[in-house]
């Protein structure tokens, strides 16, 4: 198994998709809204992916809640991260965040999906790419609510991914469209990073996804392609022992690292264990070609993806019959209603 996670276009696998999944350098897949119609179809799609290869691939999705929840019909709607703190009751917010983490993880696991790239640890709501995905602008409040959501995910049996290290919240630009630059002073950026540092010290983050953001006070490369951030800071200073993902290498924020093949090489050299390449099949194929060349000189085989597989076994039918699921779903539905009222009165 290698370091690359890929995507595909449809609601079922094509022969080309299956062939790609069988490449020994592919570690798994990331799913999007375009891959989902309704629960029965998703169940069949996951079975197709599992049957395509003898290796157990890592099946992942962005399912944070709010505007970044790829599967909606038939799933519990997870409130956006900002909604929890708007309750103005920290203990209640933490309790609901635990429930949200548990529900989002259990529902995905019930479909044999291993991982949601959750939680977002960026501070503040001004960044276009982050906005309501952030728990709070106050680092301690964000830390406490995120920690509770992580506990809920872990209770369900899902690993967690903190993103976007060392912090994407204070750049206005959207890294999907350009490479943002955070030109604040070192001390301020280091303060933003403390939420990652504390959760690493608590042993709560299983994986970390760095930002496609440049921090000139430290380095001239995006964090996703910077050995300073990924090796010196994350591994040596913060003693992070988990898995590092690149964010999507097809995003415009990664373009300063070169073409797709070059981006992959830069990210690997900088210290990314696993690479995401989405929404551009030709780009993914170029990366795979480059990885095959690199693999001849130095083995790129890695078991890092296997560390993130879920071991919980439950069917969706079993889950939805449980009182715990129904209780949590009701509470989250009420929070969604409160958030809708808040959002409409603040626009």
Stretch-by-stretch model annotation:
Residues 1-27, 256-347:
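Preference for extracellular/luminal or secreted protein segments
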Residues 1-59, 67-75, 345-347:
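N-terminal hydrophobic targeting/anchoring segments and the immediately downstream early-domain regions
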Residues 3-13, 81-99, 178-190, 250-258:
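Active-site mouth loops of central-metabolism enzymes
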Residues 28-34, 114-120, 272-275:
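Divalent metal-dependent hydrolysis catalytic cores, especially in the metallo-beta-lactamase
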Residues 34-52, 57, 69, 147-154, ...:
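Second-shell residues forming the walls of enzyme active-site clefts
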Residues 37-44, 88-106, 138-144, 187-190:
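Glycine-rich anion/phosphate-binding loops
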Residues 50-79, 97-122, 142, 149-166:
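Glycine-rich, aromatic-flanked loop segments that form ligand/cofactor-binding clefts
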Residues 121-129:
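Short, conserved phosphate-binding/catalytic loop or strand-edge motifs used
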